[in-house]
């Protein structure tokens, strides 16, 4: 087992309201040969509005902190979908500051340049205005949660979108 734990992986999971459990098969596979770390973000509905906003800069900073905490030596970072851009930013900023950087950075399924190989999501983004998205996919957290009033893109919408794009794969992965 000693050699296994020399190889470390940080999986940077998506932030958008669902949990890292969606990556359990990836983690299970990587655990055979690596010490695995994975991010699991607090659902925004549980963060009081008084805690302030959370933006791209914060996301990048957290990824940097994870890398520093684990240690970049023998670390491989895998970002899955949404966090590819913040992960690229975090590692690039570490490098530009002369800090240690991971041995590798693997970006899976994330749009670094969404203009290349556009998808149905890109087409929707080009067809609809910013105001349309604000009024159709951004909701206030209900009063029953600590984050009441916080404006969020709910994870259930993201997850439903994933299922709608490839229903057969999702059905097979759970049955």
Task: Indicate where each model-derived feature is located.
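Short beta-strand element of the alpha/beta-hydrolase
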Residues: 7-14
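Conserved alpha/beta-hydrolase
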Residues: 30-45
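Gly/Ala-rich beta-loop-alpha elbow adjacent to hydrolase catalytic centers
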Residues: 79-84
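The serine-hydrolase catalytic nucleophile loop
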Residues: 19-26
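Conserved acidic catalytic loop of the alpha/beta-hydrolase fold
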Residues: 46, 58-75, 88
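Short, small-residue-biased leader/transition segments that mark boundaries at the very start
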Residues: 2-5
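Serine-hydrolase catalytic-loop signature spanning alpha/beta hydrolases and amidase-signature enzymes
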Residues: 16-18, 36
């Amino acid at each position: 087992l000693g050699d296994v734990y020399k190889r470390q992986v940080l999986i940077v999971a998506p932030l958008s309201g669902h949990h890292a459990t969606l990556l359990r098969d990836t983690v299970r596979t990587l655990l055979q040969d690596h010490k695995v770390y994975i991010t699991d973000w607090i659902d925004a509905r549980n963060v009081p509005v008084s805690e302030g906003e959370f933006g791209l800069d914060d996301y990048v900073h957290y990824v940097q902190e994870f890398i520093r905490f684990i240690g970049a030596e023998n670390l491989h970072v895998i970002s899955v979908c949404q966090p590819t851009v913040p992960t690229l930013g975090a590692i690039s900023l570490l490098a530009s500051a002369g800090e240690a950087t991971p041995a590798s950075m693997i970006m899976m399924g994330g749009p670094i340049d969404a203009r290349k190989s556009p998808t149905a999501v890109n087409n929707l983004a080009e067809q609809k205005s910013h105001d349309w998205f604000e009024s159709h996919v951004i909701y206030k957290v209900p009063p029953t949660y600590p984050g009441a009033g916080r404006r969020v893109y709910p994870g259930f919408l993201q997850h439903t979108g994933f299922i709608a794009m490839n229903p057969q794969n999702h059905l097979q992965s759970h049955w």
